[in-house]
From Swiss-Prot:
Name by which UniProt lists this protein: Small ribosomal subunit protein uS8
Subunit structure as annotated in this protein's UniProt entry: Part of the 30S ribosomal subunit. Contacts proteins S5 and S12.
GO cellular component entries: ribonucleoprotein complex; ribosome
Signal peptide (from-to): none
GO biological process, any: translation
Length: 131
């Protein structure tokens, strides 16, 4: 049976892994998941990610990050979901925690943060909020 929302599954695995103080979490790989992991790494929310073959299928390993024994990601939540897609123009993109967090946005120019999308004057689908 196929998964209805693989991105929500990815975010839940990261959230649960950090609550359990895991070093890393693994999940099935896709181009969108890799792009989201790259944004999280660039913003300093995770230590890194790698792609490995497991049983003939690619797996994405995400190395979680902690500071003083606490998870760096305090909140990670899905915004746009299969039942209710959320699209915003460049001027309407939300500011997460008044600029302290990021919104990850899928745009025609690729997956990027809300700040990069605003600077490039491009809108898109708001995938999730991270703080």
């Amino acid at each position: 049976m196929s998964m209805s929302d693989p991105i929500a599954d990815m975010l839940t695995r990261i959230r649960n892994g950090q609550q359990a103080q895991k070093v890393s979490v693994s999940m099935p790989c896709s181009k969108l998941k890799v792009a989201i992991a790259k944004v999280l790494q660039d913003e300093g929310y995770i230590d890194g990610y790698s792609i490995r073959e497991a049983g003939g299928k690619p797996e994405l390993d995400v190395a979680l990050k902690y500071y003083a024994g606490r998870p760096v990601i305090e909140r990670i939540e899905r915004v746009s979901r299969p039942g209710l897609r959320v699209y915003k123009g460049s001027g309407d993109l939300p500011r997460v925690m008044n600029g302290l967090g990021v919104a990850i946005v899928s745009t025609p120019r690729g997956v990027m943060t809300d700040r990069a999308a605003r600077a490039g004057r491009v809108g898109g689908e708001v995938i999730c909020y991270v703080a």
